[in-house]
């Protein structure tokens, strides 16, 4: 889990647009965040396994 201060800091509008970065909406993780879902890879995987994301299925071939 990310520190509350870092989550609050990321919610503020940066002085320069380049400084903005994405965080997971669920846990606050800053790395490996999928923009389409707004989730990190860990949360995305957990929610997909539980069937909480419509249209997402585990691939098998």
From Swiss-Prot:
It comes from the Bacteria. One of its GO terms (molecular function) is zinc ion binding. GO terms for biological process: translation. GO terms for cellular component: cytoplasm; small ribosomal subunit. Part of the 30S ribosomal subunit. Contacts proteins S3 and S10. PROSITE patterns: RIBOSOMAL_S14 (PS00527). Keywords: Metal-binding, Ribonucleoprotein, Ribosomal protein, RNA-binding, rRNA-binding, Zinc. Pfam families: Ribosomal_S14. The gene is rpsZ. The keyword Metal-binding applies. Belongs to the universal ribosomal protein uS14 family. Zinc-binding uS14 subfamily. This is Small ribosomal subunit protein uS14. Signal peptide: none annotated. NCBIfam families: PRK08061.1.
């Amino acid at each position: 889990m990310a520190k509350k201060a870092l989550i609050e800091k990321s919610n503020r509008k940066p002085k320069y647009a380049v400084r903005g970065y994405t965080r997971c909406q669920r846990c606050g993780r800053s790395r490996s965040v999928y923009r389409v879902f707004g989730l990190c890879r860990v949360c995305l995987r957990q929610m997909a396994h539980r069937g909480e994301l419509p249209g997402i299925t585990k691939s098998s071939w």
